[in-house]
Structure formats: structure tokens, C-alpha cells
Amino acid sequence: MSTRHHIAAALLALGLGSLSLGAHATHYPLKVDNCGYTLEFSKAPGSVITVGQAGTEMLYALGLGSKVAGTSLWFNPVLPKFKDINAKVPRLADNDPSFEAVVEKRPGLVVSQFEWQIGKEGVVATREQFHDLKIPTYLMPSDCEGKDNLVGA
């Protein structure tokens, strides 16, 4: 399964959308293994904060733009087909948002594109900082599986 499909499947499993892709209904409580953490959900997250353009545009592509409560870290302009929905989503920062800016939105889930943003030495925060506040974090598997981000390999 490609990374993009893996991420899409995980986000759909979290119940963030009601797209019909031939999948079975999501049942709660739900456990999702992600980059060394087990995330537990008693219900589908009502809102998501994204740290990274890739995760944001993936949610838009899945029809979940209305669930994105804030976004940050953009390297390029949004794709033209997502321009309208993106205009409705608050930009917390063009680069790395502050921990406080993310927490202030009270998200049900934070999705991060890179571990250096939300990870062991995250410039935004560690995953534990969010988890201590009962805010689950989902890290793109392509940035953690088989990779040691502390040494850049």
C-alpha cells in the first residue's frame, strides 16, 4: 500500500469522513497504531489541525476540508481545485505554528507531516505534550517508519 493510501485509510478509519470506498463501518472505541504510539478514539474527532501542506491537501482531497480547524507549514500555493475550501481554513502560521496556537483551537486530532515538527524534539511540541492534554497526534508514516529523524537518516 502506498504511503498516501496508508494515510488516507488511517484518516478514514478515524471516522473523519463518510466517504464510501467499500470499507466497513468504523466501530468505536478505535485503536490506531502510528509511529510507535497507539492512539485510542472513543468517537470520531470533530476537528483536525494540520501541520504540513501534504496532510491538509490530503484531507481536502478526501472531502474532509470542513473538519480542518487550522493549518500551517505551507511550501507552495494550494492546488487550484482546493482554493475555495482552503480560503475558509484559518492559517495558524505559514511555517511552524506555536504549541499554544494549535492547542487554542482545541482539536480532536493533530496531523503532522514531519516528526521534526511534532516528535521527540519537535519544534512545535512533542507528541507527549499534546497527549498530556488529551489531544491525539498522527504523524505521516513516511516520516517515521524505518527512519531515524534524530540523525537525519
PLM regions: where:
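Bacterial Sec-exported substrate-binding components of ABC uptake systems
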Residues: 3, 12, 16, 20-57
